[in-house]
Amino acid sequence: YLRTAYSVDPRGWAKFDYVRMPEYRWGILLAPQEENRVIPFGEDYGKPAWQEVPGEHRAMLRRLIVIQGDTEPASVEQQRHLGKTAPSLYDMRNLFQVNVEEGRHLWAMVYLLQKYFGRDGREEADDLLRRRSGDADSPRMLGAFNEATPDWLSFFMFTYFTDRDGKMQLHSLAQSGFDPLSRTCRFMLTEEAHHMFVGETGITRVVQRTCDAMNEAGITDPNDIAR
């Protein structure tokens, strides 16, 4: 089963429930629309938030959505093989939950491209599926998402550091004057918190077990690995 968010209230509080994996479905999940929402900063500060893409910002908004969308399946491509070496059922379940939510985030970005950006958006959405992490001919757009994730320590580091950077990126997009993008990213933030939890607790467990093993072996110098 997965413990996943299924709604979020206007104050930002998410509601979670347990869903059996065969029953899990990707959906277009948006935070509730804020009545009379205005653009919070920039040259258009104080104006009503855009419900459609303004022509003068079309290319820039499409680029932001494409870059964000490109990172989501990339992390799944980097991490999916780790199920073969999961340290525990708990870790495997966390891996599955992170991966299905990253996949849903791609789905959400594709929805925006398809619904609001016409033929250009559809072509960009196709390219999101064409590119592959680490592929020599069609790599992902950002270098970090073309690196290998060979083991679980790398996975914990990724979810602790890279997903933390991703959280800041989603926070910035959640402030967008383009309201559908803002609402989409506000919901995605409810799921991103769990990804960082997986990283933080995973690293904590690794450090704790290392300290326990050193104490059991009588090692006080971490460089003294011969013993």
Predicted regions and their residues:
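Internal, conserved structured core segments that host functional sites
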Residues: 148-194
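Terminal targeting/low-complexity segments that flank the catalytic cores of oxidoreductases
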Residues: 1-93, 115-149, 153, 227
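C-terminal transmembrane helix end/exit motif
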Residues: 116-117, 202-209
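Short, charged, amphipathic alpha-helical segments
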Residues: 93-97, 183-186
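Alpha-helical transition-metal enzyme core signature, strongest for iron centers
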Residues: 68-76, 98-113, 131-138, 159-166, ...
